């Protein structure tokens, strides 16, 4: 479980790498089988009070990114599907005064999870990302993770389909590009606080060498199938 490992943010990477290195000694795989927002997650106000916005969605996406990239988690699960006035459900259930029954509404957290789970299929392999700066110099290891900026990870499904997930945690747009060994087109899907952008199909691109990622958004890029 990833409870109590997300603050301070600077601690997220090191504690997961330590876990990864320990498990490697014993040839044991990691499944992250349960997590939700807790009281110590102060960056988003702790667990109390349901939140439908990108605030919680981005916070959890950063958690997923670190668990997959640095802990090498082979599986990742959220705590519960439907909840009340707490940040532990993908859906919020409530009963309005005088209403005959409950109302259920979705959240950006639900769709942010889909930026990963809808495209990265069982058996997928995570791929290494190598970064270069504007002068084409290779940047230090783990450059694809900026906890308050861009966080990128890439995967190959068993059928050869490539998936790239990019989190932009920053309050401003960020631009980045990717070079991949494929001539296939890419489909782009985005979750953000912009109206209607809940795992929304944005369009196709022939290449992804220069893409602008909107503020506070999660974008998935997927190669099209033949």
Please tell me what each predicted stretch does:
Residues 137-184, 216:
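Carbohydrate-binding surface patches
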Residues 6-10, 37-42, 83-88, 171-174, ...:
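Flexible loop/turn segments at secondary-structure boundaries
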Residues 1-5, 33-37, 78-82, 167-170, ...:
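Active-site-proximal beta-strand/loop segments in catalytic clefts of secreted hydrolases
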Residues 202-226:
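C-terminal beta-strand-rich structural cap/linker in extracellular carbohydrate-active enzymes
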Residues 29-142:
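Aromatic/acidic polysaccharide-binding cleft in carbohydrate-active enzymes
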């Amino acid at each position: 479980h990833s409870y109590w490992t997300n603050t301070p943010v600077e601690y997220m990477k090191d504690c997961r790498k330590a876990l990864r290195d320990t498990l490697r000694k014993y040839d044991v795989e990691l499944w992250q089988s349960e997590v939700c927002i807790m009281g110590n997650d102060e960056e988003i106000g702790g667990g109390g009070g349901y939140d439908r916005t990108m605030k919680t969605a981005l916070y959890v996406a950063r958690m997923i990114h670190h668990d997959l990239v640095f802990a090498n988690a082979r599986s990742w699960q959220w705590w519960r599907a439907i909840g009340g006035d707490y940040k532990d459900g993908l859906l919020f259930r409530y009963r309005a005064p005088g209403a005959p029954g409950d109302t259920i509404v979705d959240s950006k957290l639900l769709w942010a999870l889909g930026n990963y789970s809808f495209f990265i299929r069982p058996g997928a392999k995570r791929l290494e990302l190598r970064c270069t700066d504007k002068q084409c110099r290779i940047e230090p290891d783990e450059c694809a993770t900026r906890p308050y900026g861009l966080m990128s990870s890439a995967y190959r499904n068993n059928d050869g389909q490539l998936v790239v997930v990019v989190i932009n945690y920053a309050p401003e747009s960020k631009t980045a590009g990717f070079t991949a060994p494929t001539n296939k087109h890419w489909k782009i899907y985005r979750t953000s606080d912009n109206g209607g952008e809940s795992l929304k199909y944005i369009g196709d691109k022939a290449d992804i060498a220069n893409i602008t990622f909107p503020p506070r958004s999660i974008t998935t890029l997927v190669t099209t199938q033949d």
